[in-house]
Amino acid sequence: MQYLQPLSAASQEVKTEQTKLAELAGRKVDYQVQDKHYELKANEMLTSVRYIDGKYQFDTAALKNKINEINQAQATLGKTFTFTTSTGKTIQVPGKTYGWALRDSDVIASITKAYETGKPSLNAVNDIYGIGYLTYGTGYDTTLNGGLGNTYAEVSIADQHVWLYKNGQQVASIDVVTGKKSTGEDTPTGVWYIMYKQSPSVLRGSSAGSGSYEVKVNYWAQFTNSGCGFHDASWRKNWAKDAYISDGSGGCVNVKPSEMPNIYNNLSQKEAVIIY
């Protein structure tokens, strides 16, 4: 059996560890999340630190708590949005796929690496995530309108109407037909986002009582994981205000072919789609 002599406090290895720990304890990172800055001091964010065999070992419990605090204050993923409609009503709309949040593991990796290397500042843009088609989050680049921004699509089920806004200016206001209420195929309410656009496109799916379908459309902009989106509906004859009740779509927002080009051209990937 080999006996290892315990290290003395005066050994070079112990001195190196002490120096490394002292250097790290004095470091701090200016962490920017959107328009806010957080000074994250290593001696406050790291509950304990060890330096063994040339590597740091961190207890990041305090940093995790700080991440949660920032998410509570700023993140929009899964939150309920306060929204003022085009008709002047203030309503609450639950967040669905739209939004962003800080991912604990990514933030911890970024901050601890910055502590190790002495990097003084970081932007959280690389540490966020989202859900749905775009897993890196949506809406991080704006704090306007409660995080919804000033470029968005608004859909009123009761009014069977769509409004589009671009940089705060209304660029479209049209009547539409949404999902069939009588069969439970209502267009899903909540705050979504434009996942992608395609022109032309072939839509495939099924609807209650009609079986499966495959239909070509000239313009398609999807906003839910389940396959709902905006599209032209050349086959539709009934555009009445109450058509959606018993003659609605399978969940999509049907737009008149003559009006769909303007809708398509004024929708952008990642923008919020607010449906109520």
Feature locations, PLM:
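Surface-exposed, secretory/extracytoplasmic low-complexity segments enriched in Ser/Thr/Asn/Gly/Pro
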Residues: 1-215, 267-268, 274-276
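Exported/periplasmic cell-wall-interacting domains
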Residues: 64-65, 79-80, 189, 205-276
